[in-house]
Amino acid sequence: YSQVKKEKEQGCYEDFIECLKLYDKEENGTMMLAELQHALLALGESLDDEQVETLFADCMDPEDDEGFIPYSQFIQRLMSDPVVFD
């Protein structure tokens, strides 16, 4: 029961992806780093610049040649190994 309750409070992968799709201008599963940062801060908890940098360093794939990042892998990494801030 406690695991289900915890998962419900955290949201699920599909919920996060659906929210990010609202910000995905190209509708191709990628976003520019600044767009992803804006979306995460608009939808989630308030993080300072250092926390955002840590989060991206731990969970982010490199940008492609055009500066886009696939957000599904980012969410998968974030959910499988959450970043803990002190």
Swiss-Prot record:
UniProt keyword annotation of Repeat present: yes
Keywords from the named record: Motor protein, Muscle protein, Myosin, Repeat
A single GO cellular-component term on record: muscle myosin complex
SUPFAM superfamilies in the record: EF-hand
Ranges of residues in domain EF-hand: 11-46
Transmembrane segments: none
Cited InterPro entries: CALM/Myosin/TropC-like, EF-hand-dom_pair, EF_hand_dom
Entry GO MF terms: calcium ion binding
Family annotation (PANTHER family): MYOSIN LIGHT CHAIN 1, 3, MYOSIN LIGHT CHAIN ALKALI
Complex formation: Myosin is a hexamer of 2 heavy chains and 4 light chains.
Name the UniProt record assigns to this protein: Myosin light chain alkali
Lineage: Eukaryota, Metazoa, Ecdysozoa, Arthropoda, Hexapoda
